[in-house]
Design a protein with these regions (language model features):
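Charged, amphipathic alpha-helical segments
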Residues: 1-12
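Acidic, low-complexity, intrinsically disordered interaction modules
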Residues: 18-79
Length: 80
């Protein structure tokens, strides 16, 4: 996955009023981790990811942390 692909996924989710799920590798952990970003935070989180991760989406301070997937979701907790 590239920064361009990540940006496209985030912008499509924003247009469709969906939330975003980002899948990452974490050091010392055999399985991946999923982070959910709500639609209201999409622009802010995308800006953070673009600043904090390199062109191949490895974390700038720890390359063992890597974004490997992102996709739009409809995340509902109840209430507002």
């Amino acid at each position: 996955m590239t920064k361009r692909q990540l940006t496209n996924i985030f912008m499509e989710a924003k247009r469709n009023k969906c939330d975003i799920c980002v899948e990452l590798t974490i050091p010392g952990q055999d399985d991946t981790e999923f982070i959910i970003n709500k639609n209201k935070s999409i622009e802010n989180k995308l800006e953070y990811y673009l600043k904090t991760y390199d062109s191949k989406l490895g974390h700038c301070r720890n390359n063992d942390i890597r974004i490997i997937n992102a996709f739009a979701i409809d995340f509902y907790l109840g209430g507002d």
